Amino acid sequence: MTDAVQNETVQEASAQEENKLIAERRAKLDQIRKSCKANGHPNDFRRDSLAGDLQKEFGEKSKEELEALNHVVAIAGRVMAKRGPFLVIQETSGRIQAYADKDVQKVLKDKYQGLDIGDIIGVKGALHKSGKGDLYVNMEEYELLTKALRPLPEKFHGLTDQEMRYRQRYVDLIVNEDSRNAFVVRSKVMSAIRNFMISKQFMEVETPMMHVIPGGASARPFVTHHNALDMPMYLRIAPELYLKRLVVGGFDRVFEINRNFRNEGLSPRHNPEFTMMEFYMAYADYKDLMDLTEELLSSVALEVLGSTSMPYGEHTVEFGGTYTRMSMFEAIKHYNPDHAQIQALTEEDIQNRDLMVSIAKSVHVEVEPFWTCGQLLEEIFGETAEPKLMQPTFITGYPADISPLARRSDDNPFFTDRFEFFIGGREVANGFSELNDAEDQDARFKAQVEAKESGDDEAMFYDADYITALEHGLPPTAGQGIGIDRLVMLLTNTHTIRDVILFPAMRPQA
């Protein structure tokens, strides 16, 4: 018998066993409906305690102290295990045991045909401690709140199918503590970022999720149709142009934490729907943003994890201190010491397209005919340097032709005052001094339109209203976007974006 046939046989046997258990549980529910109130789904039990809080408050007390206290609590949660007379009950803060003596067990059997793993129960009783030192609640009052009709996957050797973890996240969260913890960390990261920004006098705002003209980033948008207006609209790829309109309007410091949508591929680093924090700061430049980013990330790591050092794969990354800063050109040279063409390259050579195509092909980049010199430089960097940036690093010196919204460098107008922030071998943030020259922005938008007509699907659209806004005057401003999903990946030591998005995009099941 081949492995494939054997696996199929095991799966069929597991499915048959599961169907049998589901049928048994449905039969139990039918009996419960006949004998219990609310058609077997009561909604009048109220808990007054959480397992985690009880552990903190009473975990150090002795068995005798707890007996003297006779502290009565009401808890509720999902039955995760049955160990003799003990039930293990799980809820949002953790787990606690409940003790059912013989009389209680008899009532449970008579009234509910016995409890199953996965059932949700409410329990009232005094708090005690076992001989092993574990807290438990003596079951004096109890009520089955929800009958689980499907068994949890431990019955079938755990939730081992990675894809099923994402499709049935609700089951993953029940049985996988690491998964639950990752999303607790995510929530804390969001709160820490929001509190930090507010402490720096930034105002949180909300801008449109549907755009008439998609803009603010180089990406393919999702297209929809507004029936009442009879016009196409686009799910936003970035909030940038609306946020900068607010700076024009006089809000000098604004930020937004929300979803962006990009109609692109799925990968360990990419999901079509993702969360970004974008902020804009008048009377500042990109160097100020790098300083602020160092402060923000070290603050978030310390608040959420209690340390600025954390493991990531085989590495230990350090969010504290001053981060490395180098230009894209310098990084390419630094990480390609044995590549003769790259070592001989000068900044002036970057504008030699034939030379850049030759170098790109030599490092296995598949070159598109419409790519500019800046795009070629970025692809060479992405292929040879980016994966090696494990520690926090700001990469500067982005060419203007790949930075259509960034201010040109005063030292060399081929480049812009822009950086991207890398850690763990991936980009996490992008920031720059904003282009506030309306005429230059007009010219760059037109160049983007030409690129789109030449086959670049990710080139930007021309936004006439944004040009009008700039003509009213945008003060010197710097802005940045931080990918929340990728940041959480780092802080939770996970290596695929699906592990930090509750319900990631999935291909249809066969």
UniProtKB/Swiss-Prot annotation:
EC identifiers of the protein: 6.1.1.6
Catalytic activity: tRNA(Lys) + L-lysine + ATP = L-lysyl-tRNA(Lys) + AMP + diphosphate
PROSITE patterns: AA_TRNA_LIGASE_II (PS50862)
Swiss-Prot/TrEMBL GO biological process terms: lysyl-tRNA aminoacylation
GO cellular component, one term: cytosol
Broad class of the protein's primary localization: cytoplasm
Residues annotated to bind Mg(2+) 1: E420, E427
Cellular location(s): Cytoplasm
Residues that bind Mg(2+) 2: E427
GO MF term list: ATP binding; lysine-tRNA ligase activity; magnesium ion binding; tRNA binding
Protein family membership: Belongs to the class-II aminoacyl-tRNA synthetase family.
Subunit structure and binding partners: Homodimer.
Name of this chain's protein: Lysine--tRNA ligase
Gene transcribed to yield this protein: lysS
